[in-house]
């Protein structure tokens, strides 16, 4: 039997994922748009409920750093990349957009939250600067 792929493009806070509907959830550049801790918790819990036992969530997203010093270094590196890509105006545009629209959290915050809502295995696949790929198994 062939598997079925379902895609969704919507505000994750409003999306009804159901219960035990999926074997895998892939969230790319989704969660950094969440604002308050309550939203983070609610959405992670929703994803946990939507997965079948043994299912997994895999996340690739913009992340922050828990220490100011590390955040400053990583932000400088990201800014240099953006400036090299399209110039200083582009860097300022991206940073202004992030400041207005995004609230990324650290990988450690998200890993702890995945465990808190019931995921049993958390795996960090990759982290480079302000971006990370990680996931968890239900």
Segments (PLM) and residue ranges:
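Core SAM-dependent methyltransferase catalytic element
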Residues: 111-138
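Conserved SAM-binding strand-loop segment of SAM-dependent methyltransferases
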Residues: 1-13
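C-terminal alpha-helical "lid/dimerization" subdomain adjacent to the S-adenosyl-L-methionine
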Residues: 60-117
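A conserved beta-strand element that flanks and buttresses the S-adenosyl-L-methionine
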Residues: 26-27, 58
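Hydrophobic beta-strand segment of the Class I
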Residues: 25-26, 114
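Short catalytic micro-motifs in class I SAM-dependent methyltransferases
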Residues: 29-33, 61
């Amino acid at each position: 039997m062939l598997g079925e792929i379902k895609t969704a493009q919507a505000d994750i806070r409003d999306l009804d994922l159901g219960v035990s509907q999926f074997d895998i959830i892939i969230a790319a550049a989704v969660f950094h748009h969440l604002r308050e801790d309550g939203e983070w918790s609610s959405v992670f819990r929703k994803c946990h409920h939507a997965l079948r036992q043994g299912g997994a969530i895999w996340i690739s997203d913009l992340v922050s750093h828990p220490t100011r010093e590390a955040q400053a270094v990583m932000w400088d590196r990201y800014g240099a990349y953006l400036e090299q890509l399209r110039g200083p105006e582009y860097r300022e545009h991206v940073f202004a957009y992030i400041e207005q629209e995004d609230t990324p959290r650290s990988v450690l915050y998200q890993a702890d939250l995945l465990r808190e809502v019931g995921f049993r295995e958390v795996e960090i696949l990759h982290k480079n600067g302000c971006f990370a790929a990680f996931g968890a198994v239900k």
